[in-house]
Amino acid sequence: MSRVAKAPVAIPAGVEVTLNEQTITVKGTKGSLTRVINTDVIVVVEDNEIKCSSVEGVKTNAQAGTARALINNMVVGVTEGFEKKLQLIGVGYRAKIAGNGVDLTLGFSHPLVHELPDGVSAVCPSQTEIVLTGTDKQLVGQVAAEIRGYRPPEPYKGKGVRYADEQVRRKEAKKK
């Protein structure tokens, strides 16, 4: 069994876990998440713990660790939630919340409107910051990556949309 799958996932108070065949549903204060688990993984809920083990085989060991990590992210998501911070660096780069989307001005000839999916909300503490929050870690990260993809940070001046904790590797300009 994988090292990750050996550790059980603790179920905190206020979280309800239901298991139907290979579908697991986790309900908490911030919402509920549902995921289909791989058929090579055996999931057992007992004594406020979720245990994952694999059917015999080398490939399935990795699947058990993956399933355990995904279930842990579901439990953390419905209790605490996930957040990604983005910074807009560049002259005239601005962001504001417009309805169910983020209105971005990133130096193009037109403003961009990125629609937010259900389960992800955005807040702009300032014109150059976006904070995305939600219960699904994958979905929050996906939306952040899509917004960053409009204008990724470039290595010469560092302009663009970057994650708050991202270090942009800078290059020196070409010399004559």
UniProtKB/Swiss-Prot annotation:
Highest taxon above the source species = Bacteria
Membrane-spanning intervals of the chain: none
Instruction: Please provide, in alphabetical order, the Gene Ontology terms of the cellular component aspect for this entry.
Output: cytosolic large ribosomal subunit
GO MF terms here are:
rRNA binding; structural constituent of ribosome
Q: Where is the composition biased (Basic and acidic residues)?
A: 156-170
Q: Quaternary structure?
A: Part of the 50S ribosomal subunit.
Protein name stated in the entry: Large ribosomal subunit protein uL6
Which intervals of the chain are annotated as region Disordered?
156-176
UniProt entry keywords in alphabetical sequence = Ribonucleoprotein, Ribosomal protein, RNA-binding, rRNA-binding
Which NCBIfam families did the record assign?
Answer: L6_bact
Give me any GO biological process, just one.
cytoplasmic translation
Per its UniProt record, what PROSITE patterns does this chain match? Answer: RIBOSOMAL_L6_1 (PS00525)
Q: Which InterPro entries does its entry note?
A: Ribosomal_uL6-like, Ribosomal_uL6-like_a/b-dom_sf, Ribosomal_uL6_a/b-dom, Ribosomal_uL6_bac-type, Ribosomal_uL6_CS
Family statement drawn from the similarity comment of this UniProt entry: Belongs to the universal ribosomal protein uL6 family.
**Function (record text):** This protein binds to the 23S rRNA, and is important in its secondary structure. It is located near the subunit interface in the base of the L7/L12 stalk, and near the tRNA binding site of the peptidyltransferase center.
Annotated HAMAP family: Ribosomal_uL6_B
Q: Cite a single Pfam family from the UniProt record.
A: Ribosomal_L6
